[in-house]
């Protein structure tokens, strides 16, 4: 079920197994075995940060469980896609684990993909690199990335700044490989628009936080259902970098959104909100929650397969209307 007027740059071995050109975005403390399995079985790509597993041994167990779970479907499922954070202590060990499992796709973030590309290519794995600027795109292409994930304004958590229309078209002028749009994709209509814009896939994160299979708390899910676009706050206060967070969660944590320190450094933000000491403030991602502009599309807590079903119907209708 893809845009009829644009060929996908994805390899056929992957594209043919997708019901939708969609990645359930890898989200810290949210994406785990159950969510990834449900999404892959429903026909979309399920992604997760390797850092969500507490150790490399747990990561190995997670991958084994996901592989077994999707195999039980009895037919080819959509791929699962680990997200490898480059600048983290477990990078080499996590990379080696992914190589042992011969995963089909990996997303790299927070740093150049260069150190990961060759080992992953050696086992036939596609490498997608997170980028937030044209310079990032150039560097990722030079490093050998197979695909680019464009982090744009409206993405939840650590976010981008660029307008998605301008960013996608500028990247398409220099790169003909797979492009993924990340930020503000609310439903199947937006997914269809991303395909027409020139993307091969799109991220959807916020919608899947509210899925029953996510690792989010019930309170987090309820807040997503109760929130709209106007409840998203762009702030540097908790990470030292721009992040899209739920304003109601900041208030619930006892802070005044109008009086946050927007000049804080990454190190100081980590000290205050990273949860490493008792003197700090509320823990980011645990007590202060992220969401993207697509939060207005979260209307209920449902299963991941139900979300994929809804998006698929909207996606199909969007192209039927466009063809009329």
Could you describe each region identified by the protein language model?
Residues 30, 185-186:
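Residue-level detector of alpha-helix initiation sites
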Residues 164-180, 186-324:
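Conserved active-site-proximal phosphate/metal-binding subdomains
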Residues 1-178:
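Active-site entrance/lid segments in N-terminal catalytic domains of soluble metabolic enzymes
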